[in-house]
């Protein structure tokens, strides 16, 4: 199906939140959307993000931490920023690109339950989007 839409999840370091969002996006939206994630910087995939997603049987060990790709950004149908920093510093998006902000706490450097909570919140938000388009 070549006429898939493109959704692009952005956060500061493409380490935790946007990695989880990419994985949930592929699970819930993969049949209709090309799903990508990136950051203003590339901090590497957080090992606890990998562990948290493994807990819900989603393997993100092959996902990479990438900086924002202008080509993907410019052709994206929807850009979703996941933290206030990325929302403020995100490159300008072309007029045809729909951009929304879904804020989630950054679990990096926090206790393990924070990773589980943020993982579940992101999963629920993307599931809702897959069901309602909002």
UniProtKB/Swiss-Prot annotation:
Active-site residues from the entry: 11 (nucleophile), 83 (nucleophile), 90 (nucleophile)
Alphabetical UniProt keywords: Arsenical resistance, Cytoplasm, Disulfide bond, Oxidoreductase, Redox-active center
Catalytic activity as recorded in UniProt: arsenate + [thioredoxin]-dithiol + H(+) = arsenite + [thioredoxin]-disulfide + H2O
Superkingdom per UniProt: Bacteria
Disulfide bonds, paired cysteine numbers: 11-83, 83-90
Any Pfam family the entry gives: LMWPc
Recorded GO MF terms: arsenate reductase (thioredoxin) activity; protein tyrosine phosphatase activity
EC number(s) stated in the UniProt entry for this protein: 1.20.4.4
GO cellular component annotations of the record: cytoplasm
Subcellular localization(s) per the UniProt record: Cytoplasm
GO biological process entries: response to arsenic-containing substance
Protein role: Catalyzes the reduction of arsenate [As(V)] to arsenite [As(III)].
Annotated family: Belongs to the low molecular weight phosphotyrosine protein phosphatase family. Thioredoxin-coupled ArsC subfamily.
Name under which the protein is recorded: Arsenate reductase
């Amino acid at each position: 199906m070549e006429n898939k839409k493109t959704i692009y999840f952005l956060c500061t370091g493409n380490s935790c939140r946007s990695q989880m969002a990419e994985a949930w996006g592929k699970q819930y939206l993969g049949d209709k959307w090309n799903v990508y994630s990136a950051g203003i910087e590339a901090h590497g995939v957080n090992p606890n993000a990998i562990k948290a997603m493994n807990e819900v049987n989603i393997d993100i060990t092959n996902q990479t931490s990438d900086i924002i790709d202008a080509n993907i950004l410019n052709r994206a149908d929807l850009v979703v920023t996941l933290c206030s920093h990325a929302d403020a510093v995100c490159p300008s998006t072309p007029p045809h690109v729909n951009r929304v902000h879904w804020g989630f706490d950054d679990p990096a450097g926090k206790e393990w339950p924070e990773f589980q909570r943020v993982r579940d919140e992101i999963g629920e938000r993307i599931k809702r989007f897959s069901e309602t388009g909002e």
